[in-house]
UniProtKB/Swiss-Prot annotation:
Domain of life: Bacteria
Protein name, per record: Acetyl-coenzyme A synthetase
SUPFAM superfamilies cross-referenced by the UniProt entry: Acetyl-CoA synthetase-like
Organism: Campylobacter jejuni subsp. jejuni serotype O:2 (strain ATCC 700819 / NCTC 11168)
GO annotation (BP), single: acetyl-CoA biosynthetic process from acetate
Residues binding ATP, per UniProt: 387-389, 411-416, 504, 519, 530
Gene name in the database record: acsA
Presence of the UniProt keyword Magnesium in the record: yes
GO cellular component: cytosol
GO molecular function, one term: metal ion binding
PTM annotation, UniProt: Acetylated. Deacetylation by the SIR2-homolog deacetylase activates the enzyme.
EC number: 6.2.1.1
Reaction it catalyzes: acetate + ATP + CoA = acetyl-CoA + AMP + diphosphate
HAMAP family listed in its UniProt record: Ac_CoA_synth
């Protein structure tokens, strides 16, 4: 069976489908039809079946103040109870979390132990004055205490905001200030590529100015490197938590009470604090674990994502634990101490469901394509990819070499803002197409449309929108309702009503499958990490030679995308093309400090100007076309100075061809 691009469709094996939760496309379409015919009834049934409510909800969906939607009003619950306490009768001695550190250390937390450690951490947080509604920033490595503190916050009703440990002190400071955090939880450091790296000094620098809301800092001792302690502010978690009681009653939370904030890059420079509510988020985390990974009680499940990103929230911590699965957490990189580490872990821990990024797949494929053959990977039943579209050649290697042609690949599309998967194959039902997200999940009304809501025809590029609300959707941007509407509900309408625009472009193929074409806004995706171009350009502007810049993405065989900077030099600058390499190094030094090592420019081109509209907006789509060496098809007649495009094209050809 071939699609319009002559790519083979890979059908699920009959054996797998026979035992899957959703066994075929007929069952998939039955669920879709149920959601279409009785939208609220569909979600009501799911919510009552999946969640252990303290008190039942009285209203499924409140659209009175759309797009500020509310779900399951009147209901009360606690997310940590959903993930831990409810499993005590049947799974108390089952492994909940297995941790492997980079230095070879290993630890197993049963559901009973994880509950006890969560309660002890929750009691410690309360002793430090943290109460319902307070914000706790977590700046931690991939160690069990990170998940424990997240669950402890959920238990007492505090709102956690995890900040990726690779972010700079300045980026951390911005997030602490915006959230108004009362407490910061960090570690002395951790290990990466066999060496200790530090986190506490970054916290010290972040708190050195403008973080008046922070009262205390809790430090988990991980790598035992020397750190500075500030008396009256800094306390060692490990010493204090062991004295706490292992009993802590869960706070009764309303369905719409916030569970966490997670900051994501925006096109205006300032990161956006995405808000997620308790009931809708945990419901969809659990449902997608069951549907997309076909999670079963016997599964050892591994998602390789860092908890600093939404994937780590939903598919390392909350989703697996809500389902009563065993989740694997690892510290380190895919290629240390060698390129066989991940395959050795799959063999050793008998992983059955494995979820990772296309960047990691491409890296391992390039580094040691035959290494997986040294290991027994036969326990794998489902493979998954996340963070960016996967190119067909990487997909095929993953399918052939890692899955042995028997494990379906769920190529998942979703976002920080969606809370969980939105468009993805179902492993027992959907014929797979390499590099294609395929079909929306039941209950998710994802469509490729134009600005007026007209559905695009096969092969036509359009806007990827979600035309109905869903339980795990973003509830707003922390402290900025106007930006929430502008960012997500101002680009497209359907039937006269504003709908959620993802920021991605997409098209339908002849099978009705959706293929994601990438960002349409000023956000780049490097190795699965979204970074706002405005944030990068603001940092670059601190270089004395830079008058103006525009940053776009170019294709990268390992990262998927990397950064290309068009730089206009200041009149006083003495820099020329001969100094480009040195300037590139200097710019990357600035970016490392301002944002972190994930923001690294790979190529730089000096230009006399940038293509702008008459209103002054930089046309990054044109620059992206030039940077990628593609033919310009955009209309440049409306530009303030169309000749600048011709100049940039000539400079790019001279520099890079």
């Amino acid at each position: 069976m071939l699609n319009q691009n002559n790519q083979e469709l890979f059908k699920p094996s009959k054996e797998f489908s026979r035992n899957a939760r959703i066994k075929n496309l007929c069952e998939y379409y039955d669920l879709c039809d149920e959601a279409k015919e009785d939208f609220e009834g569909f979600w009501k049934r799911q919510a009552f079946e999946k969640i252990e409510w303290f008190s039942p909800f009285s209203r499924v969906l409140n659209e009175d103040k759309a797009p500020f939607y509310k779900w399951f009003e009147g209901g009360t619950l606690n997310v940590s109870y959903q993930c831990l306490d409810r499993h005590m009768k049947t799974r108390r001695n089952k492994a909940a979390l297995i941790f492997e550190g980079e230095m070879g250390d290993y630890e197993v937390y049963t559901y009973r132990r994880l509950l006890h450690e969560t309660c002890k951490a929750a009691n410690l947080l309360k002793k430090f004055g943290v109460k319902k509604g307070d914000r706790v920033v977590i700046y931690m490595p991939m160690i069990p205490e990170t998940a424990i503190v997240m669950l402890a916050c959920a238990r007492i009703g505090a709102i956690h905001s995890v900040v990726f440990g690779g972010f700079s002190p300045e980026a951390l400071r911005d997030r602490i200030i915006d959230a108004g955090a009362k407490l910061v939880v960090t570690a002395d450091g951790a290990f990466r590529r066999g060496k200790p790296y530090m986190l506490k000094p970054a916290v010290d620098k972040a708190l050195s100015e403008g973080c008046e809301s922070v009262e205390k800092v809790l430090i988990v001792i991980r790598n035992n490197e020397p750190i500075e302690y500030i008396k009256g502010r800094d306390y060692v978690y490990n010493e204090l938590v062991k004295n706490e009681s292992y009993k802590c009653e869960p706070e009764i939370m309303d369905s719409e009470d916030l569970l966490f904030l997670l900051y994501t890059s925006g096109s205006t420079g300032k990161p956006k604090g995405v808000m997620h509510a308790s009931a809708g988020y945990i419901l969809w985390a659990q449902m997608t674990m069951e549907w997309v990974f076909d999670i079963k009680d016997y599964d050892n499940y591994w998602c390789s994502a860092d908890v600093g990103w939404i994937t780590g929230h939903t598919y390392v911590v909350y989703g697996p634990l809500a389902c009563g699965a065993t989740t694997i957490m690892h510290e380190g990189t895919p290629t240390y101490p060698n390129s066989g580490r991940w395959w050795r872990m799959i063999e050793e821990y008998q992983i059955s469901k494995f979820y990772t990024s296309p960047t990691a797949i491409r890296m391992l494929h390039a580094d040691a394509p035959n290494e997986p053959r040294k290991y027994d990977l036969s326990t794998l039943e489902v493979l998954g990819t996340v963070g960016e579209p996967i190119n067909p050649s990487a997909w095929k290697w993953f399918y052939d070499e890692i899955g042995g042609t028997k494990s379906p690949i769920v190529d998942t599309w979703w976002q920080t803002e969606t809370g969980g998967h939105m468009i993805t194959p179902l492993p027992g039902a959907t014929p797979l197409k390499p590099g294609c997200a395929t079909l929306p999940l039941p209950g998710i009304f994802a469509e490729v449309i134009d600005e007026e809501g007209n559905k695009k025809d096969e092969g036509e590029d359009g806007l990827l929108c979600i035309t109905k609300p869903w339980p795990s959707m973003i509830r707003g941007i922390w402290g900025n309702d106007e930006r929430y509407i502008e960012s997500y509900f101002s680009q497209a309408k359907k039937d006269g009503k504003a709908v959620y625009f993802s920021g991605d472009g997409a098209f339908y193929d002849k099978n009705g499958y959706i293929t994601i074409t990438g960002r349409t806004d000023d956000v780049v995706n490097v190795a699965g990490h979204r970074i706002g171009t405005a944030e990068i350009e603001s940092a670059i502007a601190k270089h004395p030679s830079v008058a103006e810049s525009a940053v776009v993405s170019i294709l990268d065989t390992i990262k998927g995308e990397s950064l290309f900077a068009f730089v206009v030099l200041s009149p006083a600058s003495s820099c020329d093309l001969g100094g480009a390499i040195e300037t590139l190094k200097e710019l990357n030094d600035i970016l490392r400090v301002e944002i972190g090592p994930i923001a690294k420019i790979e190529k730089i081109l000096y230009t006399p100007g940038l293509p702008k509209t008459r209103s002054g907006k930089i046309m990054r789509r044109i620059l992206r076309t030039i940077a990628r060496g593609e033919e310009i098809k955009q209309d440049i007649s409306t530009l303030e100075d169309s000749k600048v495009v011709e100049t940039i094209v000539k400079l790019a050809k001279a520099e890079f061809e």
